Amino acid sequence: GASTSILVDAHPHIGTDKLPRVIENMRNTIIQCGGEVHFETRMDALLIEKDEVKGIETNTGKTFLGPVILATGHSARDVYRWLAANNVEIEAKGIAVGVRLEHPATLIDQIQYHNRNGRGKYLPAAEYSFVNQVDGRGVYSFCMCPGGFVVPAASGPEQIVVNGMSPSNRGSRWSNSGMVVELRPEDIEQFTIDNLQFTISMQHDSAANCQLPTVNSQLSMMYFQEYLERLCWQQGNMKQTAPAQRMADFTKKKLSYDLPETSYAPGLVSSPLHFWMPSFIAERLSKGFQLFGKYSR
């Protein structure tokens, strides 16, 4: 379903508008090869006998026996909670946390093509890639969406998560990318339990039928992620308007009194990200922004 240009492009791009057809074709290929796809079906438990996984039990009551691969993706947090509650060995992994930057596409074109007139008629919307080390942790751009949009991507209630997408023609007036800080489990060990209280303290997970682990557990990074997503929601007036700040104001630690036009449909609310974001993230982001500004000249 994608353009044939992905076979030769250095940075192949399918386009969000074409992804549904691509996914449908992938699903049909799996079925043609003898696989099955079960919609509206959730794994509720692993079937374990003598410390060996024998299969799964689903919300429909049906069981599937045989080897199991948990391809959980980004947000299947109920699976991780079940595993921790049932003594399946898992461990915390590093994550990357940050913000999404948005600029006029014409500005990025001018910078990257070194031409004040931009890209002209024949060149594609310009991309960039930024990677650096700040205080012993990586600060880098990812998922750069030239000619794209910033979109809401929360997977649960009382969360704000944003992502980027580009249509196949990369034709919007904006370009955006994630700018994130590398985090390791040891980075949040000193993060106060009070900040995570709403997530982990004396909660009862009905799906796992167990008491949730403490912050210093194999789920600590997941709880920290949930904390940040809810904090963003609170700072966004408890709806899907995203808290935002101009990059220059973030580095100067001052509130933005106005915000530029955005592709993010729910809208923005000015917020002092530098103040409420955990300092070990905000300080590295600030230094990264300053390096990015020099890189982008």
Residue ranges with predicted function:
Residues 1-194, 200-208, 213-297:
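Residues forming the flavin
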